[in-house]
Amino acid sequence: MEVLIHKSVYYKIFDKTFNNSSHRYIQENHSINEAEILANIESITNYFKAQDILILNQVHSNQIVNADEHIVTIPEADGSITTKKNLVLTVQSADCVPVLLASDDGKIIGVAHAGWQGSINNIISNIVTKMIEKGAKNLIAVIGPAIAQSSYEVDDKYYKTFLSKDINNKRFFINSIKENHYMFDLPAFVELKLNESGVKDIKNITEDTYTNPSKYPSKRRSYHMQVPYNEKILSAIVIK
């Protein structure tokens, strides 16, 4: 468990080195046993000695859930915020960028799943705005492990989508050895969006999910190796 705000906010990146979980947290297909999922979720909750945990049904959106309000058990969204103590907020990832946020007074926390679609459609500014509306000041962020630029090849359509939003996004792409393809720096793009939203205090975990198979699940690596993909990194944060 890592300290984000002294004596109030704590977080952890639950990767493959955490042995008390099979790293499956939502039933995406029938090959995953519900009892296994519940045991994994309970293991994370117990790790923090927390009262409750929020798992999201992530859909690559820019939607943020206010967990202070009554919500469904597994809401369809890609981020959440809360002022509640002992409620663990989580996001799942396996190449996309997990972002953890806290007000420096330790009273408000948030999490966001920043894939390329959510990132280009303002999930970062959405969550920062919602936290500020609840009274957050001087936000601190953690950018979790994600796919690195050297591992993330994209096509020309993807490249043009980003440039159509802002020509300056060109800086996050370099040419691939493959014609009409590029290598994209998603973590750097997410960091820019945090900076543009006023978040300057950022801890960046710069480990590449794609090239660390013993530590991190990677959807793209699984696809390239033609092996089943059903594990996730769980990034979690809590107010104590």
Swiss-Prot record:
The keyword Zinc applies. It catalyses: adenosine + phosphate = alpha-D-ribose 1-phosphate + adenine; S-methyl-5'-thioadenosine + phosphate = 5-(methylsulfanyl)-alpha-D-ribose 1-phosphate + adenine; inosine + phosphate = alpha-D-ribose 1-phosphate + hypoxanthine; adenosine + H2O + H(+) = inosine + NH4(+). Gene3D superfamilies: CNF1/YfiH-like putative cysteine hydrolases. It comes from the Bacteria. Zn(2+) binds at H60, C96, H113. The keyword Metal-binding applies. CDD domains: YfiH (cd16833). GO terms for molecular function: adenosine deaminase activity; copper ion binding; oxidoreductase activity; S-methyl-5-thioadenosine phosphorylase activity. Keywords: Copper, Hydrolase, Metal-binding, Oxidoreductase, Transferase, Zinc. Its EC number is 2.4.2.1, 3.5.4.4, 2.4.2.28. InterPro entries: Cu_polyphenol_OxRdtase (IPR003730), Cu_polyphenol_OxRdtase_sf (IPR038371), Cytotoxic_necrot_fac-like_cat (IPR011324). Its cofactor is Cu(2+); Zn(2+). Purine nucleoside enzyme that catalyzes the phosphorolysis of adenosine and inosine nucleosides, yielding D-ribose 1-phosphate and the respective free bases, adenine and hypoxanthine. Also catalyzes the phosphorolysis of S-methyl-5'-thioadenosine into adenine and S-methyl-5-thio-alpha-D-ribose 1-phosphate. Also has adenosine deaminase activity. Homodimer. Belongs to the purine nucleoside phosphorylase YfiH/LACC1 family. This is Purine nucleoside phosphorylase RP494. It comes from Rickettsia prowazekii (strain Madrid E). The lineage of its organism: Bacteria, Pseudomonadati, Pseudomonadota, Alphaproteobacteria, Rickettsiales.
